[in-house]
C-alpha cells in the first residue's frame, strides 16, 4: 500500500496539541490556533461565506437543446424531454431543500422557484444555457439551477456547478453579480424514474455552487469515493436502489460552510488523543486536523452508518489528505482502504501516513502520533 500502510496495532501517545473550544475527551487541551492554511481557506472561494447561511434562492431554468446540436456534451442523442420550470421545481423541492437543511442542521436551505426557458443554437455549448439563464434571472435570485432537456453522452459528466465570484462590497449579491450556477442534463428527469427521480446529482452540483471541490477522484476524473456528496453522489443507490439523495459530505466541507464551528475542530501539531463525535452531528469534537506544516493537512472524522450515510457497512473513522494550492483547496484524497473507501478504520486499527500515525481505540477514541522521518 506504499505510503498508506494499514496494520492492526496500537501505539501509545503523548502530549496534546489541541484547538480552542470544547472537546469530547477527558484531557485538558492546550490552546492551538487553526492552521494558517485552514484559516486562509475560510476567506477563499472554497468557503461558503454568505452562500451557506439561511435561504439560498435558486431560479430553475430549462435549456432547450436543438436536435442537431454539435456539442460533445449531448453526444448526438435524440431524446428531448418536455420539461418545464414549474415541473422541475416541484420535483427538486421534494428532496433537495430537506437534504441541505439536515446536512446543515437548519443553518442553510436552498429555495427553488420557477425561472424560465432558454434555447441555444446547434453550435452552442452548455455554457450558453447558463449564460442565458443568468441573463434572464430576477434580481432576487442568488443562483440558477439549469436543466437541459437533452441527455448527456455516456462519456460526458452529468453536470457542473460553480460558486462564481464573491459578493460585491456594495449592492445585492445576486446571480447577475456572482454567476453562481448548478447545471445538469436531462437523464435524472427521465420518465423511467417515475415520480421519484434521483436528486443526488443536483445536490452534488449545488455543492459546487457553495464552493466545494471534488473528493476521491482519479486522474481521469472518475468519482471513486462513496463517502462524500462531492465524489460518487450515487453511492447510496448502489447499495439501495430506492435511495434518491446523496451521501452526506465530509467534515471539511461542513467546516468551510460554517455548519461545523471551529470550536468543534481539534488541531494536532504534535501527538494528540481525543474522543470523536460523528461529523454529521451537531455537537462535540467532530474533526481532527493534523497540520503537517507543509501546506497540506490530514483530516480524521467519525462517520456513522445512518441517515444519509446508511449505505456504509459500519460506523468507522475516515481519513483524508487535503492539498491546498494557490490559497484554495485543490484535492481531497481518501487514505483508508481501496475504492469506494467504504471500509473505514475500526477500533484496533492503525493508519500510517508518512511521519504520522492515526490509531483508533474503543469508543471512537483517536490518537495521532508524530515521529521524525530520518
Give a label for each model feature.
Residues 1, 28, 151, 235, ...:
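Residue-level marker of positions within ordered structural domains that often coincide
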Residues 29-201, 210-218, 223, 326-374:
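Propeptide-to-catalytic entry region of secreted or membrane-anchored zinc metalloproteases
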Residues 64, 148, 232, 302, ...:
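Pocket-edge structural micro-motifs
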Residues 1-27:
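Secretory targeting and sorting signals
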Residues 261-373:
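Pan-zinc metallopeptidase signature
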Amino acid at each position: 500500500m506504499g505510503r498508506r500502510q494499514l496494520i492492526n496495532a496500537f501505539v501509545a501517545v503523548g502530549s496534546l496539541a489541541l484547538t480552542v473550544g470544547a472537546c469530547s475527551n477527558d484531557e485538558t487541551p492546550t490552546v492551538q490556533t487553526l492552521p494558517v492554511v485552514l484559516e486562509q481557506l475560510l476567506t477563499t472561494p472554497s468557503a461558503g461565506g454568505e452562500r451557506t447561511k439561511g435561504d439560498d434562492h435558486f431560479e430553475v431554468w430549462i435549456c432547450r437543446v436543438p436536435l442537431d446540436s454539435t456539442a460533445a456534451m449531448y453526444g448526438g442523442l435524440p431524446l428531448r424531454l418536455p420539461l418545464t420550470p414549474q415541473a422541475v421545481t416541484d420535483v427538486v423541492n421534494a428532496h433537495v431543500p430537506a437534504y441541505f437543511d439536515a446536512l446543515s442542521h437548519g443553518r442553510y436551505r436552498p429555495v427553488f422557484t420557477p425561472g424560465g426557458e432558454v434555447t441555444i443554437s446547434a453550435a452552442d455549448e452548455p455554457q450558453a444555457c447558463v449564460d442565458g439563464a443568468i441573463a434572464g434571472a430576477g434580481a432576487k435570485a442568488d443562483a440558477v439551477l439549469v436543466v437541459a432537456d437533452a441527455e448527456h453522452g455516456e462519456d460526458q459528466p452529468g453536470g457542473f456547478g460553480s460558486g462564481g465570484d464573491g459578493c460585491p462590497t456594495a449592492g445585492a449579491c445576486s446571480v447577475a453579480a456572482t454567476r453562481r450556477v448548478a447545471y445538469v442534463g436531462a437523464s435524472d428527469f427521465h420518465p423511467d424514474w417515475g415520480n421519484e427521480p434521483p436528486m443526488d446529482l443536483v445536490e452534488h452540483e449545488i455543492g459546487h455552487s457553495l464552493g466545494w471541490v471534488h473528493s476521491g477522484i482519479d486522474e481521469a476524473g472518475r468519482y471513486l469515493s462513496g463517502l462524500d456528496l462531492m465524489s460518487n453522489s450515487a453511492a447510496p443507490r448502489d447499495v439501495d436502489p430506492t435511495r434518491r439523495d446523496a451521501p452526506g459530505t465530509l467534515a471539511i466541507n461542513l467546516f468551510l460552510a460554517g455548519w461545523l464551528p471551529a470550536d468543534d475542530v481539534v488541531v494536532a501539531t504534535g501527538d494528540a488523543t481525543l474522543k470523536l463525535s460523528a461529523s454529521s452531528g451537531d455537537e462535540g469534537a467532530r474533526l481532527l486536523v493534523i497540520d503537517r506544516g507543509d501546506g497540506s493537512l490530514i483530516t480524521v472524522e467519525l462517520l456513522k452508518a445512518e441517515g444519509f450515510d446508511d449505505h456504509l457497512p459500519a460506523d468507522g473513522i475516515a481519513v483524508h489528505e487535503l492539498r491546498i494550492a494557490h490559497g484554495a483547496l485543490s484535492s481531497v484524497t481518501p487514505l483508508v482502504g481501496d475504492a469506494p473507501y467504504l471500509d473505514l478504520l475500526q477500533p484496533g486499527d492503525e493508519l500510517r501516513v508518512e511521519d504520522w500515525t492515526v490509531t483508533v481505540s474503543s469508543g471512537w477514541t483517536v490518537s495521532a502520533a508524530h515521529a521524525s522521518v530520518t
